[in-house]
């Protein structure tokens, strides 16, 4: 007789082969409008806000974008299954130099000169370019399975956004932290603009360092000779520099009051420098003195008719250079700080292209600063002032956009003063949108002080992020927020034509903001309209009474653009702080810091409760991905071959706080892991075709093995959910794979097959197992949904035939922890599982010895000890099923001792006949089958 039709073999339409690249497209169509439905469903629940750090609207998305957006999506979806009303509004950074450069490139191809084009027309082209890539990237992000308010993203070029930035400038001015100053800033001579600290990256650079002597004036020589017994030769101080091109801007020399300086004799002159300098190694010291005795001595510039003085400075360290640092306040921040102290105005004879101006010596005028290095060195050599030159490799700032070296250059710029006390700048506030109430909480603290204080109120993931941010805040200079470009939000300040006084009244900023937000052109109106059209009627200079004004031509730093997003995106909707900001670890000095500083400057508090950072993507060997190396992998190519869910699984497969490896072999391994997860879901569905949720048996009434798995899985699910909530996604992944592969596939599912297949539909034995299978399926699907979103939604569609009245989408469900436990049973099974390991090992040995071919052919004899005797007696009727053998006997035997339990275990040939239906060996048959099968046909 053929018993096949009497066996409950698995049945499901849930395919074994995922075919994700096609199936996901179907699911994406179903998700249209889902975000809006979720917001409606969760209305009134506690709000959870992840504020999106805006990617740049240029080019297609790369693997770093995918990592970033998927991590954000996982966080949001975890909040969804936790029961929150999740607010995620994607954004784009739309202004800035890269877009300008791309538009310029397109214009050049058409032989159109940008300079001949009206600024508002050029800005229109930039806007169109950004819009194009917003649309492209939006579709690519959607393909990753990211849920969000994609119909209403925020764009930094949106008129309302730009208008709010104008208000933020007003708040910063009102709070006394925004000022205009002539001071050195990072300057890219190729892009011809100032750059913020966050826009430079340090790279190794070869340069020529030089030792140069500066001759002391006779009067200063005499001062030294009165203190020291010196030969009658000219005295020179020695400076060491790696930037010879800054020598034309030299206005002084810094020394240290605490360093010991020495005099050495060389050729026809005496040299004065610090005792530890490499230059005086193995030279005889004629005399020595402390640095404080050098203050005020004067020297002659080596090639300019200019004298300078020696000034004490905390920036001079022993052991580096010569103990004397040449000071060019127009080309160095430390130089500027010391110069300011002693009344030295910044001097920079270099234009925006990095070429020396008419203020420089004739022999270098018109030269690029880097070209001038060799010319200056040669000049010093010929005039006898060069003592030594050598090549060095040092860390030097480069423009993060064009990758060229930048310089420090003093120019008039707008700054946010990080050490300025935040107090109301105005006697009164004329507009409710620019108020002073937030400032009261600051108690006259500076931005730096308040920012440092706020870092302790923020949760940092990983924790090292806090120290990184603190280090940057403690050492950063004032924030230069002005740029000399076209495509950005203008700094909306007017100057009196007659006396140059700026208009700083708050109502003027509000007036301009309203013009921007009421126009489809937004900030372009600044370039379209003249001053009278932009100013309130009858505006008068309070200083001189003039009615004629001129507009500021600089635009805002793009970091101010994105850093003020909290004010443009969150606060108008009543959200003072986002729950999470998440970006790459480079954003500590970028968006995180810009957001923190801008928020404190305007509102006196951090805009975020938590900051999560991720590492960067590298290839399988740990190398940085680059086109030149040929190791770049496109996320879109991965999706095409494997599907987005494999990419999403990759994101949690390693510790994302470190750099994450990606390559073909890694993707293949992940595809295998995905199959294990999918087969787990399929096993559950396949064995639930005749089950309904209402058939479920109460946990405490289940078969003891099912009861064990229910209690054990409840703990595992809580563990997994805890990993989610603590952002420990790689731990979630490894525990998930362990649970799926070992606890379910190798144990529970393996043991369960016999009971599921052989017992009647509707029987207690089958229903008990099915109750747990559905419990596993539902909880696994919900817990998988933040990561394997497409697969979870696909699985969920099959669950609707099992449980009535399920919500439309898996994401409309909440994870609810089970409070069921049975500690005694869990302890019993801990021991039984150890015994199972020993039994399976013994069976495998006998299979290799050809004693048995299949576990069902085995009879296992176990000799119990005192610890195991009661346990084996308690479960003796179930042990054969648990070990997947035909028979188990508790008796004396001469078998080998088990590794885990130390019990003697012997495997023999099972007694009796093989049941043709269940394949178990039994000693009694009824109507040609075993007694159990005879009752289940």
UniProtKB/Swiss-Prot annotation:
Motif 'HIGH' region per UniProt: ranges: 55-65
Ligand binding (L-isoleucyl-5'-AMP): 583
Binding sites annotated in the UniProt record for Zn(2+): 915, 918, 930, 933
Compartments where located: Cytoplasm
GO cellular component, one term: cytosol
Biological process (GO), any one: isoleucyl-tRNA aminoacylation
Cofactor note: Binds 1 zinc ion per subunit.
E.C. designation(s): 6.1.1.5
Short sequence motif 'KMSKS' region: positions: 624-628
Pfam families: Anticodon_1, tRNA-synt_1
PANTHER family listed in its UniProt record: ISOLEUCINE--TRNA LIGASE, MITOCHONDRIAL, SOLEUCYL-TRNA SYNTHETASE
HAMAP family in UniProt: Ile_tRNA_synth_type1
Complex formation: Monomer.
Full protein name: Isoleucine--tRNA ligase
Primary gene name: ileS
